[in-house]
Swiss-Prot record:
Domain of life: Bacteria
Signal peptide: 1-37
Enzyme class: hydrolase
Function: Protease that can cleave T7 RNA polymerase. Specific for paired basic residues.
Record's protein name: Outer membrane protease E
Keyword set, alphabetical order: Aspartyl protease, Cell outer membrane, Hydrolase, Membrane, Protease, Signal, Transmembrane, Transmembrane beta strand
Family from the record: Belongs to the peptidase A26 family.
Gene Ontology MF term list: aspartic-type endopeptidase activity
UniProt EC number: 3.4.23.-
Protein localization: Cell outer membrane
Gene name tied to this protein: pgtE
InterPro entries in alphabetical order: OM_adhesin/peptidase_omptin (IPR020080), OMP_A26_sf (IPR053724), Peptidase_A26_CS (IPR020079), Peptidase_A26_omptin (IPR000036)
Main location: membrane
GO biological process: proteolysis
């Protein structure tokens, strides 16, 4: 009888231990494991479109496309299935077409360091801009009011512009004039896609909370499309394995136990990637391809947003 009692006690202790361990691996599906946020803000930045002589590496052309105070809407949905893990989906998009600016410089002479041709296009619109980001965070260090860890994710970002009208100076000032007002000259779009790694941190004191995030990628693939409407030419470029750096910080205050108002600043830098270019003649249908480092694609941008976060 005594042996049976001991056996029952051992089975009970073992079962409780197994249950406790298995419970650690059961994801939290309660509503308070889910957090969502919505914010509005502005986007600013600049993209560069470059053309090179593949034989000498000399820069032949550079177009600077600016983004100026474009209104954005940003959303975030995160789930914390375990105390040491957070799954997150977030993104932002322009709310409408916005203001931009474009300057086009050409270096047609190898015998002079300065540009030979320039056109300026103040009437440039940002047709759209958007980004989405899917990531997972693993919290390696946790305390009562802080946590820090690593992150990995996938991100895609897109921009599009149209330049109309403008003025030009060609052949070192030999030809000076204006393009027809309101007529499309050049349309340009970029797309960046990449996996990334990074570091994340969170700190809270009373009702104040601050979050920081650093992201890095050495595996950026970039695509662009350049439509020269007046010349009826299309230029398409693709680059691989360029670098990206990103950082964001947000600070907020809990107005209730579940709701927080916050402001965020986020910065992204896509370093120049170089690759081949395809040229399509829209009139004849002829195409040509130049391999090597014939073209370059780059962008840097930042957003400033403010909004509301809610934990269910």
């Amino acid at each position: 009888m005594k042996k049976h009692a001991i056996a029952v006690m051992m089975i009970a202790v073992f079962s409780e231990s197994v249950y406790a361990e298995s419970a650690l691996f059961i994801p939290d599906v309660s509503p308070d494991s889910v957090t969502t946020s919505l914010s509005v803000g502005v986007l600013n930045g600049k993209s560069r479109e470059l053309v090179y002589d593949t034989d000498t590496g000399r820069k032949l052309s550079q177009l600077d496309w600016k983004i100026k105070n474009v209104a954005t809407l940003q959303g975030d949905l995160s789930w914390e299935p375990y105390s040491f893990m957070t799954l997150d989906a977030r993104g932002w998009t322009s709310l409408a077409s916005g203001s931009g600016h474009m300057v086009d410089h050409d270096w047609m002479s190898s015998e002079q360091p300065g540009w030979t041709d320039r056109s300026i296009h103040p009437d440039t619109s940002v047709n759209y801009a958007n980004e989405y980001d899917l990531n997972v965070k693993g919290w390696l260090l946790q305390g009562d009011n802080y946590k820090a860890g690593v992150t990995a994710g996938y991100q895609e970002t897109r921009f599009s512009w149209t330049a109309r009208g403008g003025s030009y100076i060609y052949d070192n000032g030999r030809y000076i004039g204006n393009f027809p007002h309101g007529v499309r000259g050049i349309g340009y779009s970029q797309r960046f896609e990449m996996p990334y790694i990074g570091l994340a941190g969170d700190y809270r004191i009373n009702d104040f909370e601050c979050n920081v995030l650093f992201k890095y990628s050495d595996w950026v693939n970039a695509h662009d499309n350049d439509e020269h409407y007046m010349r009826k030419l299309t230029f398409r470029e693709k680059t691989e394995n360029s670098r990206y750096y990103g950082a964001s910080i947000d600070a907020g205050y809990y107005i209730t136990s579940n709701a927080k108002i916050f402001a965020e600043f986020a910065y992204s830098k896509y370093e120049e990637g170089k690759g081949g270019t395809q040229i399509i003649d829209k009139t004849s249908g002829d195409t040509a391809y130049f391999g090597g480092d014939a073209a370059g694609i780059a962008n840097n941008n930042y957003t400033v947003t403010a909004g509301l976060q809610y934990r269910f």
